[in-house]
């Protein structure tokens, strides 16, 4: 599955997003964004750029974090993007495989994309 991906590490007040053209091919390094209309619109702009470059509609991938991830999932589904919600246990397994144990939101955004490309999970139902 070589589709473009916007991976998001969701946190309480702000989250981090990284964009990939395909597995291992980064388009945008992990950057923070606020949970505001302006912050979300900047991510939609990134998704539009990904689609223009690749000719494929990107998917949004994030970890299930309950109250924090639900509004983000709804936002992207309303914008007609497929959203893949990963089980946190899946991404935790990826962290355990890493040689260096690093817990930072930017690195987590990359790991979320890695789990997506390795496991090919199906998009969540709207």
Each language-model region and where it sits:
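Phosphate- and other anionic-substrate recognition elements at nucleic-acid/protein interfaces
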Residues: 1-126
């Amino acid at each position: 599955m070589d589709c473009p991906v916007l991976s998001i590490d969701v946190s309480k007040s702000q989250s981090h997003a990284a964009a990939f053209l395909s597995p291992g091919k980064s388009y945008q390094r992990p950057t923070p964004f606020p949970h505001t209309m302006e912050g979300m619109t900047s991510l939609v702009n990134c998704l539009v750029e990904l689609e223009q470059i690749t000719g494929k509609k990107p998917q949004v991938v994030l970890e299930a974090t309950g109250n924090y991830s639900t509004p983000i999932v709804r936002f992207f589904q309303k914008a007609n993007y497929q959203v893949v919600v990963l089980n946190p246990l899946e991404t935790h397994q990826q962290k355990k495989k890493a040689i260096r144990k690093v817990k930072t939101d930017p690195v987590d955004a990359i790991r979320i994309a890695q789990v997506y490309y390795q496991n090919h999970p199906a998009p969540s139902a709207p």
